[in-house]
Amino acid sequence: MVGSPRAPLLLLASLIVALALALAVSPAAAQGPRKGRLLGGLMEADVNEEGVQEALSFAVSEFNKRSNDAYQSRVVRVVRARKQVVSGMNYFLDVELGRTTCTKSQANLDSCPFHNQPHLKREKLCSFQVYVVPWMNTINLVKFSCQD
């Protein structure tokens, strides 16, 4: 007696239905979709988080190295901080930078006051993307752009 050619298809369909039912009643499905979380998607980040602070400090340092300005800039305020888990971490930082009275030869940027004279005072809105791979001890400024 030869088996029906539809038997393997029927068995496969039964397995698919059983798997779909099992997934539908699993505890993870019962919790519903997570709001605001997409694997590999952008998430809002706490500005005070250690990783954000490290990325911010690196971004400003690189900005100052690449700038042709005789004076250094530092953060006035962080407008927005986001992060993205990849094979490491991408940080997307929107930052308002202000021109300080410190020249590039001065080391401690944190204690540098901002220029208050109108002809020397400059503020920029900058967007930075910083890529960090902690286990490889690497950090890179992927891209940045600024507007006066």
UniProtKB/Swiss-Prot annotation:
Q: Which GO terms describe its cellular component?
A: cytoplasm; extracellular space; vesicle
Q: Where is this motif: Secondary area of contact?
A: 84-88
Q: What InterPro entries does its record include?
A: Cystatin_dom, Cystatin_sf, Prot_inh_cystat_CS
Query: Would you indicate the residue range of the signal peptide?
Result: 1-30
Q: Where is this site: Reactive site?
A: 40
Q: Does the keyword Disulfide bond apply?
A: yes
Domain of life of the source: Eukaryota
Query: Where does the record place the modification Pyrrolidone carboxylic acid?
Result: 31
Q: Which UniProt keywords apply?
A: Disulfide bond, Protease inhibitor, Pyrrolidone carboxylic acid, Secreted, Signal, Thiol protease inhibitor
The principal localisation class reads secreted
Pfam families from the xrefs? Cystatin (PF00031)
- Give the UniProt family note: Belongs to the cystatin family.
Q: What protein name applies here? A: Cystatin-C
Q: Gene name?
A: CST3
